[in-house]
Amino acid sequence: MTAATPATTTPARPPHTIRMHVRDNVAIVANDGGLPAGTVLPSGLVLRDKVPQGHKVALVDLPADGPVLRYGIPIGYVMQAIPAGSWVHERLLHMP
């Protein structure tokens, strides 16, 4: 018996994310309609969740109480650990 590997998805258009600053640990999904779970980003990161257009995706594992960096500065703090490839939405953050 072999372990199942997660299914990956290739959207009709190549996945496009925007990382505003080199220190950022999240990127913004720019594809019209967002990206489905399983999408492989150019970096090789696989999305764990469907991420709507204009929303953030974790580029690395984000530890509980750690900062979410956008534009190189904290925009919020993680309430519980968020794995890389996950949708980072406001319900998961303490806002400054």
Task: Please state what every model-predicted region is.
Residues 1-96:
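Well-ordered secondary-structure scaffolds
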